[in-house]
Amino acid sequence: KGKTNNNLPNFKLGFDYTNSSNTGIHRQLGINFKAGNTFNYESGFDSETFDLQATDVYWNFPEIESNLIIAGVGELSAQLQIPLGFKIDTDKPVTLMIDEKDNMENYAIYLVDLLTGQIFNMKTPKILNLAKGTYEDRFILIFGGTALGVDDETLLNKIFVYSDNQNNEI
């Protein structure tokens, strides 16, 4: 059999932390972008996280009840928002980074903190200092770049609204 050529845009998101035994842990999430895929579970494109740790990261799509380690979503665009979930059981910082990026040469990846409105270009690792807890509605990844006509300045001028459902605040 011949080798298949996968030209789908995709990237691997890395997550580093130190566990309670003082061991460095690295989790990796994968995602690819293909026309016709959705945020619903699609066999062959999505895979659940079966070994969720006390401190961990996962794709957190509202349409799917389980947490994903691998996801296939629709086409890459400036409108696409990929929700991230974090489970934090440490007082130590955690680090998020792009481990690998394929067929996305004209795209930058940004982490958005919907609570603070901050936007971070993920071309360098991002250290997060989060209190213990679960974060499922706070962080998303968005995409920009020359192919989309979106630059850093445009992204910085976007307005994000965060709704805190527990405290009924915006």
Locations of regions flagged by a protein language model:
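Compositionally biased Ser/Thr/Gly- and acidic/asparagine-rich
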Residues: 1-170
